[in-house]
Amino acid sequence: MTKTILVVDDSASMRQVIGIALKSAGYTVIEGRDGKDALSKLAGQKVHLIISDVNMPVMDGISFVKEVKQMQNYKFTPIMMLTTESDDARKREGQAAGARAWMVKPFKVEQLLGAVQKLCMP
């Protein structure tokens, strides 16, 4: 079964780069441009993994993670934060909100795909 991944980032070019990498590895990709937009994309979808930026307009990534973890259908869905922030305090804040993994941009595609594969394991 193909796994579906929601990619949330306010940068269209970053969503495109991540999307190409994931699609080439056989994943189905849904995109959201910020946390609020991404929440609307979750309705009626089955998503196996969420990859989210932290700093976004309208709704930031940490607030988005908190909202997702309150949703019955997604409370156990793994979330990876993919961000330019390397601050340990911010990372702890993301983990406390419910993010399972934290990857700093720029990243190597192989690194991203390795993390995705681990997070998508049953």
Locate the predicted segments by residue.
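Charged docking surfaces used in two-component/phosphorelay signaling
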Residues: 16-24
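Short hydrophobic/Thr-rich beta-strand motif most characteristic of the beta2 strand and flanking loop
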Residues: 26-33, 41
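C-terminal output helix
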Residues: 107-117
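Receiver (REC) domain active-site loop signature in two-component systems and cognate sites
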Residues: 56
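Active-site beta3 strand of CheY-like receiver
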Residues: 46-51
